[in-house]
């Protein structure tokens, strides 16, 4: 496996994304096959695992947590995302974050992303009622997030706008 240095940690160039996982005939995630895939990836040097709140009808984080539980926490890097891009009447970053920690069976996330910054979601991250960015900056200070970043499918003006506001708080971007 080829590794790249990111702020002093060695990340595998190949990451294991969990937006789509194998499913059984009844539509449920095939946890046994997923475990086999995770084991194979780790045995071959993959150490970066990426999940998110909405993946696999909100079950990806739970399955990923169960699959990684048997490995020492320091042997892998786990990334998940806050679903600010999803339409909601209210956004409670603390509630969602605590659920994510529980679902993933970890005490911290190595990488935490504000999910899918784009033209229709940037307002959610700006809205002072939710305090989303400030909440996650505080979690980083508390050591519950090691690296804070964002993912995006936005056009350049939207990305520029977001970075003008929050770029000093972000360490990475996943496009």
Regions found by a protein language model. Give the residues of each.
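Generic structural signal for short, solvent-exposed loop/turn connectors between secondary structure elements
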Residues: 1-10, 83-94
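Glycine/proline-rich, positively charged
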Residues: 25, 87-175
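N-terminal binding-site loop/beta-alpha segment at the start of enzyme catalytic domains
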Residues: 1-76, 135, 141
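Short histidine/acidic/glycine/proline-rich micro-motifs that form metal-
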Residues: 22, 53-55, 82-87, 118-119
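Structural preference for beta-strand elements that scaffold enzyme active sites
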Residues: 3, 11-15, 47-48, 75-81, ...
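Contiguous hydrophobic segments
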Residues: 37, 79-82, 117, 121-122
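Solvent-exposed, non-transmembrane amphipathic alpha-helical segments
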Residues: 31-36, 66-69, 84, 129, ...
């Amino acid at each position: 496996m080829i590794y790249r240095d990111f702020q002093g940690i060695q990340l595998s160039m190949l990451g294991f994304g969990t937006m789509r996982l194998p499913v059984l005939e009844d539509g449920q995630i095939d946890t046994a096959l997923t475990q086999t895939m995770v084991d194979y990836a780790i045995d071959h040097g993959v150490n970066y695992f990426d999940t998110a709140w909405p993946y696999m009808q909100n079950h990806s984080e739970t399955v990923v947590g169960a699959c990684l539980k048997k490995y020492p926490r320091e042997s892998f890097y786990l990334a998940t995302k806050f679903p600010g891009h999803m339409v909601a009447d209210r956004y409670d970053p603390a509630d969602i974050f605590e659920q994510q920690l529980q679902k993933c069976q970890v005490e911290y996330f190595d990488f935490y992303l504000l999910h899918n910054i784009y033209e229709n979601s940037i307002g959610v991250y700006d809205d002072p009622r939710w305090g989303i960015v400030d909440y996650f900056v505080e979690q980083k200070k508390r050591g519950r997030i090691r690296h804070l970043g964002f993912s995006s499918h936005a056009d350049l003006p939207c990305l520029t706008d977001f970075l003008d506001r929050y770029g000093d708080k972000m360490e990475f971007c996943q496009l």
